Amino acid sequence: MRIKQFLFCILLFSLTGCDLGVHQALWRPHPVDERSTEVAKLSVVEFPFTRNSMPSKYDCLILTDIHFGNKINPAWDKLFFDSLKKYRETHSTPMLFCIILGDVAHHGFASEYETVKTFQQRISEENRLSAEHRNIPMPVYHVVGNHDVYNSGWKLWQQTCYPHKSAYYFETKQLEWYFLDTASGTLGRPQFYDLKAKLHNSSKPKFIFTHYPLYSNGIVYFSLSNPRERAELISLFAQTNVKLYCSGHYHPGAYYDYAGFQEYTVKSFGSFGKYHILHIDESGEEPVYNIETIPIR
């Protein structure tokens, strides 16, 4: 009994010392079953591209685990925009939108979300689309990460991070793109069942973007927490023409081939100073993609 009490005290002390707090550690408001009960289709305003207006070949900028507010990480954002500008000057393929795979904030504090707001606005403004797309700011699509909801950060994330919802999808010529809420280490049953119905309802190839990896080198903390859910997802993806599962959370990154689809856990922006370009080609009978990793310096 004393050993159990001692271990509990150590756990409690560690939690109170990590800027999370006892209340947040033992019970967190806005669980996934409340945050994300369905995977909503984006409107034409939220995803401002039509099949006719989209080129067959295009790029997508991907970032993950920026962790604004973590003073340990280098200030990569100061170098990032110069690096991205140089990349775009030497590559002619249009870059249509950006995806951020969660953990934009480190503690979920309001001050961190102010920095997030400024950062995503700069991405949008400095990478405006061509005249064909009315020179609109480049859309930045977010998925929510576990750090984003610390300290009751969910509402701040929802207010700050476009498209202001945590589970959604859109379609391009040959693909369906799904963005899922795994910030609690699980999809939860409502989101899972809605996703399952939507995936089965379409034969198109599909991409999945979310924060938590499926496997992550077998490290429990960095993988989806429920082994049964993970097995269900792998089976579901194999049945419904999923081609890519793209995640963050595990900062060193990883790659796995499940025969039917591939899992890319991309390297983090905050810890490793990396961003990524997803190259898409929808000109053939089947879409083709590859992911290029760019060091900031």
Predicted features along the sequence, with ranges:
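Sec-dependent signal peptide recognition
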Residues: R2-C9
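C-terminal motif of bacterial Sec signal peptides marking the signal peptidase cleavage site
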Residues: S14-G17
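N-terminal active-site segment of His-dependent metallophosphoesterases
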Residues: D19-Y113
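A short acidic, helix-capping loop that chelates divalent metal ions and anchors anionic groups
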Residues: N70-K71, N151-S152, S216-I219
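Glycine-rich phosphate-binding loop signature in dinucleotide/nucleotide-binding domains
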Residues: Y87-P94, K198-K204, Q239
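Active-site-proximal segments of metal-dependent phosphoesterases and phosphodiesterases across multiple
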Residues: S203-L244
